[in-house]
Structures are given as C-alpha cells and as structure tokens.
Amino acid sequence: ELERLYGIKVLPIQADVSAGNDNAATVQNVIDKTIEEFGRIDVLINNAQASASGVSLAEHTTDQFDLAIYSGLYAAFYYMQACYPHLKETKGTVINFASGAGLFGNVGQCSYAAAKEGIRGLTRVAANEWGADDINVNVVCPLAWTAQLENFAEAYPDAFEANVHMPPMGHYGNVET
C-alpha cells in the first residue's frame, strides 16, 4: 500500500527482538536484506515498543518487564550497533523515540518508562560518541497535555517548571484534538 500511495520501495521484514531469541542474528538479517535491497542505510528510526501497561510495579512480572526492555531498549541497542558502520559511511542519522512516561513516572508503566529512559540515555551516549563520525543522533520524547500532566503541574509546580518547557508553538498537543 505504501508503494502504491507514495511511489516508494518498501521492504517488509518480520523481526522480533525478545528474550530468548538470537537477537543479534535477527537484526543482522534485517540489515543484510536492507543493504541488498537499497544498497545503503541513511537513517535508523527506533520506534517499536511493546509493554504491559496498566500493571503496577509491585505486580509486574519479569516476563512483562523483559517484554518492554527487549522490544524497546535492547532493540534500539542491537539496531544501532548493526547500523553503525553503514551510518558512518553515509554520515547518517539515528532517531530514537522515548516518552514522557519515563520523565514523569506514570503509574502502571514501570517497564515502559524504564525502557524509554534507557533509550534516552543510550541516545545521549551515541550522540557524544558518534558525532565525531558525522552521525547525527537524536531522541524524540513525545509529551501531550493530559490530565496526569496537569495534576503533576498542580502538585509539583517547581518540578514542572524545571522539567517541562513550553513547545515553540506556545501550547502542548492534546491527545483528543
């Protein structure tokens, strides 16, 4: 459908990074097929994430925690390592997605928040290490104005002011509009 709508070449590949899998081999297969099909890698975007949201920290199982850490943090780690030589060659870009959930400790999102905060840290390190190779590494940390964020602002105005800056548009996105 993307090929038809936008006139671009698409390469669908199933690749599950999870506990118990040979993740390095899974990721290398994706990289090899990508190079075979397109000849180069200019951009890596790490956005996939699964988690057991809604489960409290006290009730979280190791399997639920692993789901988030493997599908988010480990996936970003494996893909970044595998893409590094190609991105170095093309002076490419990495865009990793984190989340406001990690910034504010959303109830019921312990594994998701942990994975996303890990991705933010990994991204900072890569930006510092890979900048010398002309690889641009950034993290996108979406944050929408929600009732929970409003409650945080009211309960902790100093922390809110120190950590949440007004976007350039002058307002926050709203998940409903």
Residues of each region from the PLM?
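A conserved structural motif in NAD(P)-dependent oxidoreductases
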Residues: 167-177
